[in-house]
Amino acid sequence: MTTEDHSYKDKKVISIGIVSELTGLSVRQIRYYEERKLIYPQRSSRGTRKYSFADVERLMDIANKREDGVQTAEILKDMRKKEQMLKNDPQVRKKMLEGQLNAHFRYKNR
């Protein structure tokens, strides 16, 4: 396993109510995105949905695209395309991670 596999961003520990507060999305919208296969929460033994920080980021990205008028089918298509590129090309993965880090530090240092 890589270090990334153990990242706090990937641990599914956040309830749907908290995700709703963090993203500004309604619980219904979050469930809709799950139905459309845009997000994959983990289910506890009691059936409670649990999300990760990476899921929260993904939901915010989805919400921004929806505000721009992008349909959910197109968002899903783009997400799958991006995931495939990451799997197939380590250089693309490295560049994307570098871009995310640069964006994070630029935002943090404002």
From Swiss-Prot:
Segments forming domain HTH merR-type: 13-81
PROSITE patterns per the UniProt record, alphabetical: HTH_MERR_2
Induction comment: Under conditions of nitrogen excess, repressed by GlnR. Under conditions of nitrogen-limited growth, it positively regulates its own expression.
Keyword annotations: Activator, Cell membrane, DNA-binding, Membrane, Repressor, Transcription, Transcription regulation
Organism domain of life: Bacteria
Other observations noted: The amino acid sequences of the N-terminal DNA binding domains of TnrA and GlnR are highly similar, and both proteins bind to DNA sequences with a common consensus sequence. In contrast, the C-terminal signal transduction domains of TnrA and GlnR have no homology.
GO CC annotation: plasma membrane
UniProt key word Chloroplast: no
GO MF annotation, one: core promoter sequence-specific DNA binding
Residue spans binding DNA: 16-35
Impact noted for substituting K108E: No interaction with glutamine synthetase
Record text on subunit structure and interactions: Homodimer. Under conditions of nitrogen excess, TnrA forms a stable complex with feedback-inhibited GlnA. Interacts with GlnK-AmtB complex.
Record-given protein name: HTH-type transcriptional regulator TnrA
InterPro entries registered for this protein in UniProt: DNA-bd_dom_put_sf, MerR-type_HTH_dom, MerR_fam
GO BP: any one term: cellular response to nitrogen levels
Function: Transcription regulator that actives the transcription of genes required for nitrogen assimilation such as nrgAB (ammonium transport), nasABCDEF (nitrate/nitrite assimilation), ureABC (urea degradation) and gabP (GABA transport), during nitrogen limitation. Also represses glnRA and gltAB in the absence of ammonium. On the contrary of the MerR members, which require longer DNA sites for high-affinity binding, TnrA requires a DNA sequence of 17 nucleotides as minimal binding site.
Keyword ATP-binding included in the entry's annotation: no
Activity regulation statement: Under conditions of nitrogen excess, the DNA-binding activity is inhibited by the formation of a stable complex with feedback-inhibited GlnA. The presence of glutamine and AMP increases the inhibitory activity of glutamine synthetase by more than 1000-fold.
Compartments reported by the entry: Cell membrane
Knockout-associated phenotype: TnrA mutant is impaired in its ability to utilize allantoin, gamma-aminobutyrate, isoleucine, nitrate, urea and valine as nitrogen sources. During nitrogen-limited growth, transcription of the nrgAB, nasB, gabP, and ure genes is significantly reduced in the tnrA mutant. In contrast, the level of glnRA expression is 4-fold higher in the tnrA mutant than in wild-type cells during nitrogen restriction.
Pfam family, one: MerR_1
